[in-house]
Amino acid sequence: MAGGRRGGRAKRRKVCYFTSNGITHIDYKDVDLLRKFVSERGKILPRRVTGTNAKYQRKLTIAIKRARQMALLPYVTGE
């Protein structure tokens, strides 16, 4: 079966969190929002995992990196 699905459920399309909630500006000081898009190890989650648009993924990446520089978010977490 070339190109077909191999059983299981059909994947649900992820919706962008920012466009669905009407958020236009991503603030680097909003740490609670930024933590939703960072893994437990401190890495920025990719678009295919979070479902964000390319436009907001770029803004999100800049905000997370800025928050890391200001010591609001850690660069890495764990042992």
Curated annotation (Swiss-Prot):
Keywords (A to Z) from UniProt: Ribonucleoprotein, Ribosomal protein, RNA-binding, rRNA-binding
GO BP: translation
Domain of life: Bacteria
GO cellular component, one term: cytosolic small ribosomal subunit
GO molecular function: small ribosomal subunit rRNA binding; structural constituent of ribosome
InterPro entries for the chain: Ribosomal_bS18, Ribosomal_bS18_CS, Ribosomal_bS18_sf
SUPFAM superfamilies per the UniProt record, alphabetical: Ribosomal protein S18
Subunit structure: Part of the 30S ribosomal subunit. Forms a tight heterodimer with protein bS6.
Role description: Binds as a heterodimer with protein bS6 to the central domain of the 16S rRNA, where it helps stabilize the platform of the 30S subunit.
UniProt family annotation: Belongs to the bacterial ribosomal protein bS18 family.
Protein name (Swiss-Prot/TrEMBL): Small ribosomal subunit protein bS18
Annotated organism of origin: Bacillus velezensis (strain DSM 23117 / BGSC 10A6 / LMG 26770 / FZB42)
